[in-house]
Amino acid sequence: MKYLIVNGDDFGLTKGVNKGIVESYKNGILRSTSIMCNMPYADEASQIKEICPDLGFGIHITLDAGKPLNSPYKVSTLVDEKGYFKKGFSHSLNEADIDQIKIEIEEQIKKAFSLGVPITHMDSHHGVQSHPKVIEIFIDMAIKYNLPVRATPLDKEVILKSGVKTIDNFVYTFYDEGVEKENLLFILKKLENGITEIMTHPAYVDDELMRVSSYNTKREIERKILTDPDVIQFVKENNITLVNYSIFR
């Protein structure tokens, strides 16, 4: 059997992102999203669960965009002089305090559960989970809160060894230059048996998105492809079952 999780990253980043994710669920093949709990529109998750009853909500652990949920003095090694997360986590987290990383990750998890939506899994913004200072905390929290996780090529081996439930395949090539209908159809044709996740970033591009993200206009194209009738028909005709991470329950 071929099970497919089409996940819309970055829920909460802007209203346009949220709207694009909802549109891709209602009129397309998206069945999962992940919430940036430190972003201004994360709370909208609780408002859309009624109109998106089969949408799974994950936690998009974020350590390099926006501000932390904790007071800056509690996570001082993670933030700059203005209280924002430092950019470029691959370098900045090398000097970060592990305990501060832990309390911020757990605060984001607690925020997600407070939203009153079905929390199905954990993943991370820019793949921060794979950082050597983060991965063990990420796994420990997945175990503590009984959550499956997205595994990337950089961390799949250690996640599998931990026993945490995860996907069989992760596709991250429907992004940037790969955002073409032909590429998505190619990905779908090559799907293997098991559970595959395709990472996506659909949105309606608004002024705020242009201001806060360098990955912007391609999100609009992603949304149009995810709701394209040819894509929807291909999924139906090829016995691909659309699911979210609740399949692990």
Curated annotation (Swiss-Prot):
Cofactor(s) this protein requires: Mg(2+)
Subunit architecture: Homodimer.
Annotated Gene3D superfamilies: Glycoside hydrolase/deacetylase
Role of this protein: Probably catalyzes the deacetylation of acetylated carbohydrates an important step in the degradation of oligosaccharides.
UniProt keywords, alphabetically: Carbohydrate metabolism, Hydrolase, Magnesium, Metal-binding
Alphabetized Pfam families for the sequence: YdjC (PF04794)
GO biological process, one term: polysaccharide catabolic process
UniProt organism field: Caldanaerobacter subterraneus subsp. tengcongensis (strain DSM 15242 / JCM 11007 / NBRC 100824 / MB4) (Thermoanaerobacter tengcongensis)
Enzyme kind, highest EC tier: hydrolase
Protein name: Carbohydrate deacetylase
PANTHER family xrefs: CARBOHYDRATE DEACETYLASE, YDJC DEACETYLASE FAMILY MEMBER
Keyword field contains Magnesium: yes
Disulphide connectivity of cysteines: none
Gene Ontology MF, one: metal ion binding
Binding site for Mg(2+): H60, H125
EC number per UniProt: 3.5.1.-
Family: Belongs to the YdjC deacetylase family.
